């Protein structure tokens, strides 16, 4: 089996005005994704998804990465990843057994493009083996607990919003704590207190600051929230401030989660060495695809850090994240978006299997296990412009 073509398709889904949420990132007006296809001479086609600006990702995939994949056997997924990662130095890197990453490919949008291609290659690989992708990765489980990820409502309205997630059956929920109606610690505490009222004492509650606070404020907020039994405080400070995040972790009893904006195992190695996190949240469509996220899972496990993949995006990204969760021993929970995300729920012919108790169950079909709807590419045609506006 050989790869014959690699292509990328930019996609968007506009958000109706009555369904837009606002955070420190701005008001969400659309969702973007890049769908990646890897075709083979066997007739099998794999699909992947990448984060990053879709037109830029598509150009990188089709004009730079495709040529490094065509002619390769997708069974050799590690080899193909190393070719994409090391670029022109891939041959000496493999011969010497030492990573020699191309300077432009270590992080950023090129790594996001590599991640998307890698997901598609693993999809083809598992299809060729005739087994679900999580089994090709090394199955640990066939279901995992999901948590409802949302929580934008202002003030006391957080009680009904988060309570609604619990009413759906989720035993863990997450809310945003910065940016909706003006940041202040008293306002954040008010919203978290309302959320706790809405979900009761037995549902886990996580909070997410989107990396928008400075260290001193993050510490003050964490200490103010400790009495509300917070399961984790996500991205308290900028993802570029690993030292600051470690300071926050040392200053609070709340576990610290982060990682959705990190690239490859090397970023996570730095977080681990600084003892900056308790829960790692790599995004499979950013951190390096299936190949690299397996390495991240093993690395974090060696440090006693749990895995909770970031899974906010298209249906392809969620499906890939689900397979990661099923194949990672240290994964304990999976993100399930509660925002308006038609590219997640309306992309495939088959529905996701999320049970009334909030557990997510893996498909038993080969590969990712999902088939694109015939009208998907037309329905989600790319729309130029930013995803968030102020």
Predicted regions span which residues?
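Structured beta-strand/loop patches that form or line metal/cofactor-binding pockets in enzymes
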Residues: 1-47, 51, 339-347, 387
